[in-house]
């Protein structure tokens, strides 16, 4: 008898897999390898062959039903880590059958109010001191439950390829991805939110560091001599559009996000995230930073400002549109599950963005998790169960279309 997705999910969120942007290790935290090894043991108990790499990438595969070996492989991917923005250690979860109103989160003073359509459904919440970890342990739980059920029910299927990656939250989920070893030419990430969601358009992303060199002097005799790197950095920031920041943008609007700053009189740094859905707009944003630095260097007659820009990932839409059947099959699988599908923008990135750019088209599917990266994160059990059914249907759709072809 397959394990319910809820009990599997509750086991998974007990693992502390918060990633770290500063450790310099791969994986960035040891808990991710611990979880990968535990999941490998689960797969082997199902009779599924799998391997875990030194960097905590897990790969599993279920061979095709006899006679269907030549069908194209279906790949499913989720990530092991949780956000470094909020603690994911010692998660105290509870399951509430929601009948309306606010759900209090322990003694934290925080509350959650799910959408009205969830009345009568089971909601998994925390005590308000940690995130829940539905991003992305809901995706992992759903994939594992799908694998268990497709084997238990002896449903005919083509080759199935599974991957769980580390460090997605810090942008390193695909750093050591074994494309050839994975063995699928296309896949889906399960890293979305609301039931029915299919995402294949995400931000173009870049990171910029603005370095400001100052000149220190004794404050009592600094007139005409001191060049304060901190106030110069503030002036640089003032040249950027004040409304184009995360807290004032939505939909297709891009932004400049000052995510970190440090410094003293002699030296200061500003770290920015640049985000937009349009490639031309991304170039404009980069050029604005460079122009601001050039303007201030001329104004102060010194080479005080330097801008370093590095691309992070691209909008995967251009890659997914070349294989439209991926979204069409997902739509069909959802409709068979009684779910109304919809497309939405990812105001962020997923492993799928980098995978798609590197030749593995990979749209993103829903998991039934909400409020990611926060202490008010929650998951809907009935939606998680629907996600498992969607995956079963997806395997059917892939098989049916391939056989007809």
PLM features: residue spans?
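A non-catalytic alpha/beta surface segment that caps or lines the substrate-entry region
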Residues: 24-77, 81
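Flexible, glycine/charged-enriched surface loops at secondary-structure junctions
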Residues: 21, 53, 156-159, 242-257, ...
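Midchain, well-structured core segments that form catalytic/ion-binding scaffolds
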Residues: 99, 108, 113-115, 121-134, ...
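Short glycine/serine- and small hydrophobic-enriched flexible loop segments
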Residues: 144-151, 235-242, 393-396
């Amino acid at each position: 008898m397959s394990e319910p997705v809820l009990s599997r999910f509750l086991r998974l969120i007990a693992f502390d897999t918060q990633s770290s942007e500063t450790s310099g290790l791969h994986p960035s935290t040891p808990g991710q390898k611990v979880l990968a090894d535990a999941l490998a043991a689960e797969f082997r108990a199902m009779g599924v062959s799998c391997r875990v790499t030194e960097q905590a990438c897990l790969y599993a595969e279920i061979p095709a039903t006899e006679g269907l070996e030549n069908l194209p492989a279906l790949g499913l991917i989720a990530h092991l880590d949780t956000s470094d923005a909020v603690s994911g250690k010692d998660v105290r979860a509870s399951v509430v059958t929601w009948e309306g109103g606010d759900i209090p989160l322990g003694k934290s003073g925080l509350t959650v109010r799910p959408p009205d359509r969830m009345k009568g459904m089971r909601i998994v919440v925390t005590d308000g001191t940690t995130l829940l970890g539905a991003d992305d342990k809901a995706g992992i739980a759903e994939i594992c439950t799908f694998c268990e059920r497709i084997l238990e029910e002896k449903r005919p299927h083509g080759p199935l390829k599974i991957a769980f990656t580390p460090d997605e939250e810090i942008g390193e989920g695909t750093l050591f991805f074994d494309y050839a070893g994975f063995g699928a030419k296309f896949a889906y990430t399960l890293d979305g939110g609301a039931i029915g969601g299919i995402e294949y358009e995400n931000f173009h992303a870049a990171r910029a560091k603005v370095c400001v060199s100052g000149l220190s002097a004794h404050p009592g005799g600094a007139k005409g001599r001191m060049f304060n790197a901190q106030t110069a950095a503030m002036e640089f920031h003032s040249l950027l559009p004040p409304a184009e920041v995360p807290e004032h943008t939505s939909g297709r609007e891009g932004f400049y996000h000052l995510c970190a700053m440090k410094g003293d009189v002699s030296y200061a740094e500003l770290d920015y995230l640049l985000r937009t859905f349009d490639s031309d707009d991304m170039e404009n944003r980069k050029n604005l930073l460079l122009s601001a630095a050039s303007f201030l260097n001329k104004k102060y007659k010194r080479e005080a400002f330097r801008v370093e820009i590095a691309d992070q990932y691209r909008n995967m839409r251009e890659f997914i549109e070349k294989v439209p059947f991926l979204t069409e099959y997902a739509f069909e699988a959802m409709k068979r599950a009684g779910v109304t599908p919809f497309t939405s923008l990812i105001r962020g990135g997923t492993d799928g963005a980098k995978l798609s750019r590197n030749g593995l088209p990979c749209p993103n599917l829903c998991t039934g998790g909400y409020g990611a990266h926060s202490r008010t994160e929650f998951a809907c059990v009935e939606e998680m169960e629907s996600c498992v059914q969607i995956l079963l249907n997806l395997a059917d759709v892939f098989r049916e279309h391939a056989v007809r072809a």
